């Protein structure tokens, strides 16, 4: 399989471990820095370019999207999905993990114990703190 790791840090330990594991399992591995990717839709076709070269040979992607790149990274994952490329993490999951409230709701719904958590407008701050 041709697999790309979407990561700004090719030299990061976690990225290197993924590259090594993929290569040891006979996959063709590469790292694509999302900040060097451009997206387009042309003639009804989704296209990703990396350093102005079309990326059309991937079977799967492993997103390693940092917090500073969340929304563009999620868009990039969706775009690859539209091209038929499998992703081990969905764009929705990336966005959910960056939203603390949504994450707390999901954990609570799955019966994972979480500490008492409160969200409210700043005009209710005194009331909220008194009930915490």
Question: Which ranges hold each PLM region?
Answer:
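Active-site nucleotide/adenylate-binding loops and adjacent lid/helix of ATP-dependent enzymes
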Residues: 1-8, 15-20, 29, 40, ...
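Short, solvent-exposed loop/turn segments at secondary-structure junctions
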Residues: 10-11, 68
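Residue-level detector of functional hotspots within protein domains
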Residues: 13, 46-47, 71-73, 103
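N-terminal ordered "arm"
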Residues: 25-26, 31
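Glycine-rich, highly charged phosphate/nucleotide-binding loops
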Residues: 35-57, 67-71
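Redox-cofactor binding/interface segments in oxidoreductases and associated redox assembly factors
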Residues: 62-63
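Extended catalytic core of nucleotide-activated donor transferases of GT-like folds
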Residues: 70-80
């Amino acid at each position: 399989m041709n697999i790309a790791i979407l990561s700004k840090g090719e030299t990061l330990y976690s990225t290197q471990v993924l590259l090594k594991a993929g290569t040891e399992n006979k996959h063709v591995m590469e790292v694509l820095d999302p900040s060097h990717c451009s997206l387009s839709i042309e003639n009804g076709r989704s296209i990703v370019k990396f350093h102005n070269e079309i990326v059309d040979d991937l079977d799967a992607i492993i997103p390693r999207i940092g917090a500073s790149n969340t929304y563009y990274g999620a868009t990039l994952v969706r775009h690859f999905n539209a091209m038929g490329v499998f992703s081990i993490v969905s764009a929705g999951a990336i966005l959910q993990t960056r939203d603390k409230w949504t994450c707390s709701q999901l954990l609570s719904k799955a019966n994972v114990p979480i500490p008492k958590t409160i969200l409210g407008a700043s005009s209710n701050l005194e009331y909220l703190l008194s009930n915490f």
